[in-house]
Every structure is written in structure tokens, then in C-alpha cells.
């Protein structure tokens, strides 16, 4: 669930119940379950079709992480669910590129708005981290045409996921494909 990392199904259900649904005046329709998730999790689910993958586009989990995913899949099978390897048919490279454009351009707008509120045109190096200044520099001149292409890819990608979830109830993937870098290696992430 985007925005929530929890240790229990109960906590995740409570998070979704608290956050689901539209804000007042929302122009998009929202699906809601017939009852709160905190009540739905109190009973056993029907047999689920669970897709599983340790690959996501060009990225593949390390053997250790893939083995842990397999272990989770076997556990779910032991509970009576159908588990198999499957992925949505998507152009993952295009989707990653669109998400990167979205993140960088949205981030640049947020930083630019903060700067404008303070009468600044450039991020002060003593207040903004170097990586964030670089993201701002890269995203601040994103064109409308780039944003329109990004939205078109989002539309195609979401339709691919929609078609996938006509056949599958859940897709189970690792949160991250690689182990967390050691603290001493963080400097290399900021190197030019």
C-alpha cells in the first residue's frame, strides 16, 4: 500500500479505512468495500488468486530476497490460495520514465513554491540538501509536452494494471529488490 509500511494486516486495514475515499469536491469516483477493512479482516477470505514476482521491469531481487518471497508464496499456498508467477503486461521502462518525470517535476514545483514564498529564486545550499537541489535543477523546466506524455503513459499503465487485476486478486512483490545500502556507502549516491 503506497504511503503505508506496517507490520500487521490489522494496522494496514486501519490505515486504509482512515485514508480511503474522496476528499470533498473530488472529481474522480472512488470504489469502497461494502464494509470497513478492519471488519473484513476479522473473517477468512475466500480463495485468492495471488500473482507473485521478484522481477519488475529490468529489476530483479537479490537471491536472498527472491527466496523470502518464495517462502511467503508457499505459506499463502498452504492457506489454500492459488499462487503463481505473473506480471501485468506493461512497458516498465516507459512507466519508470513517466514516474521519474512525475516525481522530479512535482518535486521541483514544491521547492519552487517554497522558494517563492521566501522571496528566493535559487535553493540555498545551507538549507537544502545537495541531492534535492539537483532534483530541483533537473525538474524545474519540465515542459507541458513532457507532462502530457507522462500522463499518457500513466493512462496506458493503469489500464494494464486494470486488465491484470481482472484475473488476479493480489500481486505480491518485495518492497525493495536490493538490500538497504550500508550507512558508509550513502556518499556514493550523491556523487556526480
Language-model regions: role of each:
Residues 1-72:
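A short helix-breaking turn/cap at a secondary-structure junction
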Residues 11-14, 68-71, 75, 149-156, ...:
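A non-catalytic, amphipathic alpha-helix used as a structural packing/dimerization or gating element
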Residues 24-30, 77-90:
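Flexible, glycine/charged-enriched surface loops at secondary-structure junctions
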Residues 39-54, 102-162, 175-178, 183-187:
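Short helix-loop capping/hinge segments that flank enzyme active sites or metal/cofactor-binding pockets
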Residues 59-69, 101, 145-151:
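Active-site pocket-shaping loop/turn-to-helix segments
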Residues 61-62, 95, 181-184, 189:
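Short glycine-/acidic-enriched loop or helix-start segments at secondary-structure transitions
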Amino acid at each position: 500500500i503506497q504511503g503505508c509500511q506496517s507490520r500487521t494486516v490489522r494496522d494496514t486495514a486501519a490505515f486504509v479505512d482512515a485514508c480511503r475515499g474522496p476528499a470533498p469536491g473530488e472529481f474522480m469516483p472512488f470504489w469502497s468495500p461494502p464494509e470497513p477493512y478492519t471488519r473484513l479482516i476479522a473473517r477468512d477470505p475466500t480463495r485468492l488468486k495471488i500473482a507473485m514476482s521478484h522481477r519488475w521491469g529490468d529489476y530483479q531481487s537479490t537471491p536472498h530476497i527472491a527466496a523470502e518471497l518464495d517462502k511467503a508464496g508457499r505459506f499463502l499456498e498452504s492457506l489454500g490460495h492459488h499462487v503463481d508467477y505473473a506480471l501485468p503486461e506493461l512497458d516498465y521502462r516507459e512507466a519508470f520514465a513517466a514516474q521519474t518525470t512525475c516525481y522530479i517535476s512535482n518535486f521541483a514545483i514544491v521547492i519552487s513554491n517554497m522558494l517563492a514564498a521566501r522571496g528566493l529564486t535559487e535553493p540555498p545550499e545551507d538549507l537544502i540538501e545537495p541531492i534535492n537541489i539537483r532534483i530541483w535543477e533537473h525538474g524545474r523546466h519540465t515542459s507541458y509536452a513532457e507532462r502530457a506524455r507522462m500522463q499518457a503513459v500513466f493512462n496506458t499503465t493503469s489500464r494494464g494494471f486494470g486488465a491484470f487485476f481482472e484475473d488476479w486478486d493480489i500481486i505480491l512483490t518485495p518492497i525493495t529488490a536490493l538490500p538497504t545500502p550500508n550507512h558508509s556507502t550513502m556518499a556514493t549516491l550523491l556523487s556526480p
